[in-house]
Amino acid sequence: MRIKIYLLTLALSTAANGFAQERLDIPQPCQMHEQATPTPTIALTRATADKHYVIPVVFHVFGTDFNGKHVTRELIEDALRRTNDDFNARTTGDLRSGDDDPQFDKLSTPLDIEFRLAEIGPNGEATTGIVFHRLESGFGVYNPPKMQKYAWDNKKYMNVYIMNDLYGDGVTNNSGVSWYPNWEMTRFKLARVVYNGAYLGSNTDENFRRVLTHEFGHFLNLAHTFDFDNTKFPDGCHKGFHGEANPGDYVDDTPPADRQQMGPNDVNCLGGKTNWTNYMNYSYVRTSMFTKGQVNRMLAALQDKSRSCLWSDATHAKVFLPDASHPRVVLESKQELFPKDVKGNYDVTVALRVIGASAKQGPLTAGTDFTVEGLPDGLTASATGDGQMIQLHVKGMVTLGADKKFFVTIQPSATTAPDCYVGRQPLTIACDYVESELATAIKRGVETADGSRVAWAGNGDVTVTAPRGARVAVHNVYGEALVVAHVADRALTLSLGGYGHGVYIVSVTSSCGTKSYKIVLVSAKNGNHIKILPRCQ
């Protein structure tokens, strides 16, 4: 079966109308959205290949639902192990590293590199290199303030953002997007790989999970091996935009390919075979190798200052422990703590895991076994230990106009290891009165708080369930009231399909007060979709 895909670039933004919205069940290989073409001269500064490169990585996981799949620490650890096997050409099985064609199998070359989860975070905290967050979307487009809010220093960490909706357009089957080396992006904490958790590791099949390898290849300055409709990334089969010869992917030993997904029996514009199993190709059948030329190109990219800062000894001393088995306490649950109601009542348990030791059994003593800094007035914290886990309990009531960060430090006395690594774990008191899980909201149409809820239908209808007599108003971003109505019998349905795509505010006022929901109406081929975005107002 031939599967159609589309490419999103700065010059041609087709995501909103692309094939992915026609067939939400088919995963899309790579919606590459690189902000710069690969640098041709970087290959001239290639270092020798006799070095083992270690790249510190942090995975930021946003939300819990990825097209019915889930992303756990164990899944990420396994996915990264497999990606390292791909780069080092040690993948085995039916889709082994290399190519069945001897012409290309002899070109299969390992890169001596390890993408390793960070062990020390930016605040000096011990970490698994995996941070779980509230649901977010759209990091595949240019949104500096939001990305910078979560990003760890790009000069020390390779940031991988795991989310379901990469472009914030309601499409949940785009697999991944990455950017070439760029110092300005690194300096401003915008260098990144954005990837869909639905296609991470064992959440998908063995071949398609290698799209992550493909995206990491882009991160190290590799372009696609194929020509995509003679647009921004030609590979040698066609002339450039002005009739000039084009350099293709800047790699001599990857033959030109007229199109993506060419197979073993397809010939290119020169009448020759293509390296169809290359990781930088699109294939739903097999991708399993980098060539020697591509490895040389990645070695050159590793000398660029936007990438060399990642593997320096100075960086490693700040992001890795001297001994990976050293006892430490890491955050296991989400970084954000959400209130249970609109009044700002908090009753939240934060899970911390002890690695290399055990927790002290029973209640822990504040000020001795653990300390808390910056907790808002009105909230209190207590902690208990049990086996490998420490549970931090935060209770109380507070009204916030914005998220508030605080820190907890688990002292060695809370564990069985006197030399347990001590670091300040950053946590956030979220001002959202419900946990914002957009993926769940989009699929099930539910956001609940204080007995009220807002739900949506694919035709643009919004249903508000609230106490009888509650006032419901819909405003545009300019504050103009479009609809004002009252709930007659616990439910009210409003039709917004005729207003067109854009941002609207739905306010529900009852005896419990007023809560505003920010919603985004997105025009799609199969009707108007509404995404509910309850945020701090």
Give the positions of each predicted feature.
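Bacterial Sec-dependent N-terminal signal peptides
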Residues: 1-27, 527-537
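Propeptide-to-catalytic entry region of secreted or membrane-anchored zinc metalloproteases
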Residues: 21-153, 315-320
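Active-site-proximal segment of zinc-dependent metalloprotease catalytic domains
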Residues: 139-227
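The catalytic-center signature of Zn2+-dependent metalloproteases
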Residues: 200-289
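Pan-zinc metallopeptidase signature
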Residues: 284-326
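Low-complexity "stalk/linker" and mucin-like segments enriched in Ser/Thr/Pro/Ala/Gly
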Residues: 367, 371-389, 482-484
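Extracellular/luminal low-complexity segments enriched in Ser/Thr/Pro
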Residues: 389-403, 495
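C-terminal outer-membrane/trafficking sorting elements
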Residues: 441-537
